[in-house]
């Protein structure tokens, strides 16, 4: 059901892309006969496309949330009896069952559904972008499917740079969860009996949390600087490629809007790993903790 909903919403974006082309062609020549009537017709068409899209996306989010919680429930029901029946001492076991299972289920659902959307977007928009690659005024782009290949190369290059810039993030996220768990454990003991709290020890644990968080902030700052730069360049990039064709009369304003939208969709799908790198980093650290928990319960 979720995959079907994603497929339908992707097809709605395909219809919207075609709408962009015709609508902006109309705006390019507003003085044509019957222009105002056509404008209102386009507004009605937009509503016919956009409102079902919004409803379907809302339904998709609702069903995905239920799916993620049922996955969390299955993990919890699997781990609790095994934890109860073992004498193994596992650091932060309660956190791994309560928090890590919740975050693992949410992130897996979030990333998995996003990956399905990216694949379906590629299947839908690659033919459109390929067809729109004709009429290029830039000499080195005058070959079949040029815009598709540009989108692919820029996405692969961006992903490679993102991997290099964010290479230390998974380890730092894992260490962050460990230091937070150690601090939480001492605070829980103190909540039950204040006399059991050793203030210097708790403050030392907090300083460990502080040190790791500051390292994490620094590395995320590098990554976000690169990620934001890449995102902004990709917004303007298709217009840099197609602008000369517009001003030489090879294409219309509607076509350049279609290209900008289709290029963005394809590049975003190819750049899925870049856009979701922080979520993937978090998921990897959670997976590592749950894998350790699995081995301890074996």
Task: Describe the predicted segments one by one.
Residues 1-12, 31-72, 141-164, 251-267:
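Transmembrane-helix motif of ABC transporter permease domains
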Residues 1-19, 38-49, 60-65, 105-125, ...:
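Alpha-helical segments in transporter systems
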Residues 14-22, 61, 65, 69, ...:
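Short helix-terminus and kink motifs of transmembrane alpha helices
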Residues 71-88, 167-208, 267-274, 283-293:
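Short cytosolic helices in intracellular loops of multi-pass membrane proteins
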Residues 97-98, 294-298:
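Primarily ABC-family ATPase nucleotide-binding module
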Residues 98-149, 234:
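Hydrophobic alpha-helical transmembrane segments of ABC transporter permease domains
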Residues 103, 175-185, 189-237, 279-282, ...:
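An intracellular "coupling" helix at the cytosolic face of ABC transporter transmembrane type-1 domains
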Residues 129-156, 219-287:
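Helix-loop-helix
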């Amino acid at each position: 059901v979720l995959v079907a909903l994603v497929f339908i919403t992707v097809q709605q974006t395909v219809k919207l892309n075609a709408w962009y082309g015709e609508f902006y062609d109309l705006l390019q020549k507003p003085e044509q006969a019957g222009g105002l009537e056509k404008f209102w017709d386009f507004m009605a068409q937009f509503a016919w496309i956009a409102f079902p899209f919004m409803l379907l996306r809302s339904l998709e989010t609702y069903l995905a949330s239920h799916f993620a919680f049922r996955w969390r429930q299955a993990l919890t029901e699997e781990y609790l009896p095994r934890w109860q029946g073992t004498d193994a001492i596992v650091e932060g076991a309660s956190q791994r069952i309560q928090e890590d299972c919740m975050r693992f289920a949410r992130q897996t659902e979030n990333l998995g559904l996003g990956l399905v959307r990216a694949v379906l977007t590629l299947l839908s928009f690659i033919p459109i972008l390929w067809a729109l690659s004709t009429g290029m005024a830039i000499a080195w782009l005058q070959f079949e499917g040029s815009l598709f290949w540009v989108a692919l190369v820029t996405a692969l290059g961006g992903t490679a740079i993102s991997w290099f810039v964010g290479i230390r993030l998974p380890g730092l996220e894992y260490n962050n969860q460990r230091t937070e768990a150690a601090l939480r454990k001492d605070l829980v003991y103190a909540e039950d009996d204040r006399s059991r709290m050793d203030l210097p020890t708790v403050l030392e644990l907090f300083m460990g949390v502080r040190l790791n968080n500051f390292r994490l902030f620094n590395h995320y700052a590098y990554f976000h600087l690169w990620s934001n730069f890449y995102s902004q360049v990709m917004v303007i990039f298709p217009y840099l490629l197609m602008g000369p064709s517009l001003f030489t009369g090879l294409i219309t304003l509607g076509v350049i809007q279609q290209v900008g939208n289709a290029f963005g969709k394809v590049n975003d799908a190819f750049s899925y790993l870049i856009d979701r790198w922080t979520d993937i980093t978090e998921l990897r650290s959670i997976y590592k903790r749950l894998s350790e928990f699995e081995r301890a319960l074996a």
